Amino acid sequence: MLKFGAPTMVEMETLEQAVQVCTELNLDFLELNINFPQYLLKELDVKKLRDLSEKHGIFYTLHLDDEMSIADFNPYIAEGYCKTVYDAIELSKTLGIRKLNMHMSRGAKYTLPDRVIYFFEAYEKEYLERIRAFREECTKRIGDADITICVENTAGFLPFQQKAVELLLESPVFGLTFDIGHNYCSGDMDEAFILSHKDRLKHFHIHDCVEGKKDHRTLGTGVLDVKRYLALAEELGCTAVVETKTVESLKQSMDWIRRDA
């Protein structure tokens, strides 16, 4: 049975409100997003998280910072992001969180008259060395814990990012998140790549899209074949965040899933 979760939303001002939405909509989990100030790792109350989880029968996944530049050439920046991941791993061990969702930063870019070059692309060897070191440290820190860091597609994986993702996937502690709305908005840049690693696909972000590359829409109101992606997620035993941006849209999306999907 496919397990559905709620994303963190601006209108959910407290953890209690977010858990209440999960309970009211009969969702299985909440994806805690540490981009939000109240969900910064240092702000999280482990006892409260555990108590609410046990009381309401839900679990958590964790969405890491959007700008997760773990291979930045500036060591101070890279160290900060890497430490965030390492701290998230320790929190996940404490709370039994099994999936961490992570973006892959494209990094800074250099604009020429005829094209744009990304520094990670221009200095790919050094970039991949940093990715490899990050992979090894995460593998060591996770150890035999049941935790997977799931790399999410965002604006379309560029070739140097695909190489980095494949390096990460050499470790069993890494997997993939398939964001179907981001894939559509990038012109289907990522689906073939992700499905070529289908055995490592662990997590989905599900939302509909409308023409004009506008995503995070209510399920059933846009152009995506959402049913096909839900079937794939269920086939692979994945979890799925219904990643709308308002509670009302989330409610309508869950109604659509239970009625039409």
Question: What do these predicted ranges mean?
Answer:
Residues 54-55, 74-175:
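Active-site acidic/histidine proton-transfer and metal-coordination neighborhood
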